Curated annotation (Swiss-Prot):
The gene is lgt. GO terms for cellular component: plasma membrane. Its EC number is 2.5.1.145. Belongs to the Lgt family. Pfam families: LGT (PF01790). This is Phosphatidylglycerol--prolipoprotein diacylglyceryl transferase. The keyword Glycoprotein does not apply. It is a multi-pass membrane protein. The chain crosses the membrane at residues 10-30, 59-79, 92-112, 182-202, 260-280. HAMAP family: Lgt. One of its GO terms (molecular function) is phosphatidylglycerol-prolipoprotein diacylglyceryl transferase activity. PANTHER family: PHOSPHATIDYLGLYCEROL--PROLIPOPROTEIN DIACYLGLYCERYL TRANSFERASE, PROLIPOPROTEIN DIACYLGLYCERYL TRANSFERASE. Its main location: membrane. Keywords: Cell membrane, Membrane, Transferase, Transmembrane, Transmembrane helix.
Amino acid sequence: MVLYPPDDPFLISFTLFGLPIVVRWYGAIIMTGALIAALLASRRAVARGYHPDHVWNQLMLGLVLGIAGARIYYVAFEWERFAPNPWSVFNLTTGGIAIHGAIIGALLSTVIYTRYAGLPYWDWLDVCVPGFLLAQSIGRWGNFFNQEAYGRPTDLPFGLRIDPEYRVPPYNDLTTYPITTLFHPTFLYESVWNLVGVGILLWLDRRFGRLAPPERRRLNPGDLLFLYGIIYSSGRFWIEGLRIDSLCANGVGGSCEGSIRVAQLVSMVAIVVCGVLIFLNHRRPFAGTPTVRPDGDASPVSEAR
């Protein structure tokens, strides 16, 4: 089954009173992923004794900082492209965002919101991170509609058809790579990997986390965040090796010859750092187990030490 993105990247496109009303598939999918992730997080929040409104209150801040972080991260490595017209940085319709930047933005929003709402940082992150990964899994389908995040040519039956105008050199040469050339759907690989990762995190939390019977609890607050970092980064590292439109230290596309794939470098660092943090978190826990306030407020009180 060949995967072939639609020619039109717009879900909605019309003019109202002379003003263009446009909704791209990419944006709609990102928003859908964020809302579904928030639904998951709100259910997890209730199970841990938090009020679900905390999730929805943080959502807008998370979206703003996530998108800003994704754009800033991308622009930082592609500044030569934007330098002639710096205002183009704000034109997101031209493409150019990076998942690692979005993750940084989401984590920053958690720091800000937990301080504002008086929530225990590490435990609240454990509530949210399965939702982060679920949003990433859904959001990757935006790459399908944008015809991006694809890999090397393949003869697999579920290869991805990419129109020539969306291909990076030399794959836009139709003499060597005809229109029928199929490419690895790396967006799909990462989407499936992330979805499996969501299942693993939920299983570990239910089996060994705070909601497990006391005798089975093995996870400290913050562990799910670090496991999320390891799971996501492990998949991203090997999938990134298949891509031909990677963000490289010296630009986008090709094999990154003479340079490095930024996502692979960040993934390696994240795996090591998260592994060390899990070790340290079990030597001396970063936070104690939160308890519910006796006044009926569902927001837990941290016993941090």
